[in-house]
């Protein structure tokens, strides 16, 4: 089956067809940035974009994404190696502690900023409510999203 991951055409052999998108990304396509945590779509650690929409990849059978565009955290880095404004904001605001939830948090934040270029705290909290952070860095997550919104607004 064929799909596009981070802008690159990829092929997944038929013997992977019963696996989740998350498993295929991590174990077959060697893209470990998307994290496994709860396995039931309730924590947000495994969020990727499928055709532009944020989805918990642990819930999606790989056979359901044939022919679709998948964007993972690895796909946010520019070809010149520069970080996406959200990734840089995460660093600038010292968001990560354990870092486990960060890829899913960033992918969910990207979806928010693609819909709302100037979110307030309530907008951020609402958009990010499905993403859990065991370390409780929610204030820094809010700050980083606002910082990225400013930078992304200047780039447009």
Which residues fall in each region the model found?
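Signature of N-terminal electron-transfer/Fe-S-associated modules in redox systems
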Residues: 1-156
């Amino acid at each position: 089956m064929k799909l596009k991951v981070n802008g690159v055409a990829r092929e997944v052999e038929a013997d992977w067809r019963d696996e989740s998108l998350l498993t295929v990304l991590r174990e077959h396509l060697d893209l470990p940035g998307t994290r496994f945590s709860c396995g039931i779509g309730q924590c947000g650690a495994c969020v990727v974009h499928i055709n532009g929409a944020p989805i918990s990849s642990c819930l999606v059978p790989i056979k359901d994404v044939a022919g679709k565009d998948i964007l993972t955290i690895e796909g946010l880095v520019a070809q010149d190696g520069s970080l996406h404004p959200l990734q840089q904001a995460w660093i600038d605001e010292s968001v990560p502690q354990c870092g486990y939830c960060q890829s899913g948090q960033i992918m969910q934040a990207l979806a928010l900023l693609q819909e709302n270029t100037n979110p307030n705290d309530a907008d951020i909290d609402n958009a990010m409510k499905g993403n859990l952070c065991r370390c409780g860095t929610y204030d820094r997550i809010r700050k980083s999203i606002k910082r990225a919104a400013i930078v992304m607004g200047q780039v447009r």
